[in-house]
C-alpha cells in the first residue's frame, strides 16, 4: 500500500481549520507512484479522427450550466462545477452542428512525442489486499456516435472514456478498457506493448477503447454499427495529466500532482470538480432543435441523432471490486 504522510504541525492544522474552504479544495496526498506511470497505457487515436482530446478546463469556458433547459449560473469553471447539482447539464453556448474549434479540439492532436496539449486525468484508488486501481480518464468535447444505414445517431457534447490498470502490491495484473456502455478486461501480460507499456486503440468519433486495431462492431445486429481503429497518432497520457487520489470510503478526491499543463494548473483548480455528478454536455435536444430527429425501427434501432452528454469520473464505479465497471458481467480475457 502506498504510504501516507501523517505528521503535521499543530499550528498548521489550526491555520487549515480556519480556512476550511480552500483546505478541502487543495487537499493533497502522495504523488502518482512511478510504477503507475511506467505501466500506464499508451493509445493510438484513429488516423482519420476529427474530434480530438480536449482540456476539461477549456471545455467549461464554452458551457452554461442548465437544469430543465434553464440556466442555473452564467458560467462555470473547474473551481465551481463541483458545487452544481446532479440534475445539471453543462450546455454549450455555441451551435455544435457548426463544429466550432473547441468542439473538434485539433489543438489536442498528439505531437510526434505522443504528447497532447489536452491533459488526461489520472485517478488512483487504494483497496484491500494490496490493490491499487489506476484510472486513466480521457476527455473529448464531442462524441460522434456513428451511422446506421447511413443515418447518424448517438452524437453528444462531452465524452469521458477510461482505461484502468489494476496493481497488486505494485505489480500490474489486469487492464480494463471502457467502450460505450460497457468494456473489456485483459490480463496485463497478454496486452500489446510499446516499450513495455500496454498499447490500446481509440475508435474514431466514439472514442471507445480497444486492445486491438481494426473494426469493432457493437450493440446492433448484422454488424450495422462498427467502430474503426488503427495505428494513428500515439497518445501518452503521462506526458500531460492532472493526478488525483480517490477515497472510496468517504467519496473524496485529493490532489496528487501532475505533469506539464495539467500539473501546472492543478494546484489552483483543486480536486472538487471531480465531485460533479451532472452531465458534461447538453441535454438531449428536442425534435428539430439543431436538426434533431429520432428513429425507432423494432429490433434494429431506437435512437436519436443527439443524446444527452455523459457523466464524469465519479459515476464510473471507482470503488469497484471487480476489474470491470459493470461488475456482474466481468470476464478477464487471457488472449487478444
Model-identified regions with their sequence ranges:
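Short beta-strand micro-motifs enriched in acidic
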Residues: 166-170
Amino acid at each position: 500500500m502506498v504510504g501516507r504522510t501523517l505528521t503535521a504541525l499543530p499550528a498548521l492544522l489550526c491555520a487549515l481549520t480556519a480556512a476550511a474552504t480552500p483546505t478541502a479544495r487543495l487537499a493533497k496526498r502522495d504523488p502518482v507512484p512511478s510504477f503507475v506511470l511506467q505501466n500506464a497505457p499508451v493509445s493510438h487515436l484513429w488516423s482519420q479522427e476529427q474530434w480530438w482530446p480536449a482540456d476539461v478546463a477549456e471545455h467549461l469556458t464554452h458551457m452554461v450550466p442548465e437544469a430543465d433547459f434553464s440556466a442555473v449560473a452564467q458560467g462555470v469553471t473547474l473551481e465551481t462545477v463541483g458545487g452544481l447539482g446532479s440534475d445539471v447539464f453543462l450546455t454549450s453556448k455555441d451551435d455544435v452542428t457548426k463544429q466550432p474549434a473547441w468542439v473538434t479540439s485539433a489543438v489536442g492532436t498528439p505531437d510526434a512525442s505522443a504528447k497532447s496539449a489536452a491533459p488526461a486525468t489520472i485517478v488512483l484508488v487504494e483497496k484491500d489486499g494490496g490493490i491499487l486501481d489506476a484510472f486513466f480518464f480521457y476527455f473529448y468535447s464531442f462524441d460522434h456516435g456513428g451511422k446506421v444505414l447511413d443515418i447518424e445517431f448517438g452524437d453528444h457534447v462531452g465524452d469521458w472514456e477510461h482505461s484502468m490498470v489494476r496493481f497488486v502490491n505494485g505489480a500490474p495484473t489486469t487492464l480494463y478498457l471502457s467502450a460505450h456502455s460497457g468494456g473489456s478486461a485483459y490480463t496485463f501480460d497478454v496486452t500489446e506493448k510499446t516499450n513495455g507499456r500496454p498499447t490500446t486503440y481509440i475508435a474514431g468519433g466514439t472514442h471507445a477503447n480497444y486492445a486491438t486495431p481494426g473494426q469493432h462492431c457493437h450493440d446492433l445486429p448484422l454488424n450495422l454499427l462498427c467502430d474503426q481503429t488503427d495505428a494513428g497518432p500515439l497518445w501518452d497520457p503521462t506526458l500531460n495529466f492532472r493526478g488525483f487520489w480517490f477515497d472510496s470510503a468517504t467519496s473524496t478526491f485529493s490532489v496528487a500532482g501532475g505533469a506539464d499543463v495539467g500539473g501546472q494548473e492543478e494546484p489552483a483548480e483543486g480536486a472538487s470538480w471531480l465531485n460533479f455528478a451532472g452531465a458534461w454536455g447538453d441535454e438531449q435536444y428536442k425534435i428539430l432543435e439543431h436538426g434533431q430527429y429520432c428513429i425507432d425501427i423494432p429490433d434494429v434501432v431506437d435512437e436519436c441523432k443527439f443524446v444527452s452528454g455523459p457523466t464524469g469520473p465519479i459515476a464510473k464505479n471507482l470503488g469497484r471490486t471487480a476489474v470491470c465497471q459493470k461488475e456482474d458481467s466481468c470476464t478477464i480475457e487471457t488472449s487478444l
